[in-house]
Amino acid sequence: KGPFGAIAGVLAIIAGVVHMVGSSFYLVDPWKRSLWIGLTVFWIGLLLYVRIVKPLFMLRRPYRVAEVRKERGDTTTLVMQPDGHPGFRFRSGQFGWLTVWGSPFKITGHPFSFSSSAAAADGRVEMTIRNLGDFTSGIPKVPVGQRVYLDGPYGAFTIGNPADMHVLIAGGIGVTPMMSMIRT
């Protein structure tokens, strides 16, 4: 953990590349050289996107907790309002990654389904979260006004044609995507 893990990871990658170039077994043929260069560029690009580009985008589009609503049982709904931007559009049944404490660069987000209507014009987003672990036990203590970061939307558990008849069966906290479908 911490900077030691990042430094060790970078050193391991450098050692692997030096070994690969030094042994030359994987770089003898032009197609092998092209393959390894392409794979290296792809993975470095993906790493830069996940660790730098995506968090920068999230940092520029924060949300503020507008309401912390206690629900039945050990369940809490976080109502979040876009802070200085219009928010994002999602479809009922989708989810997002929520980062409450800390920077989006730490990649400490947790996935939760949206429970609010996807048709909300003001960009408000609700997530209904049940206390099931270390992170979720702190959700009821989140202060109103707290800056949070959302990454999403993700997922394909959506209703195709809303005019069609649908039967939705769910129980427990698994009902949250259906709440969004019903509210939309």
Name every feature range the model reports, one short phrase each.
Residues 53, 57-149, 166:
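Ferredoxin-reductase
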Residues 1-56, 126, 131-184:
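FNR/FR-type flavoprotein reductase catalytic core
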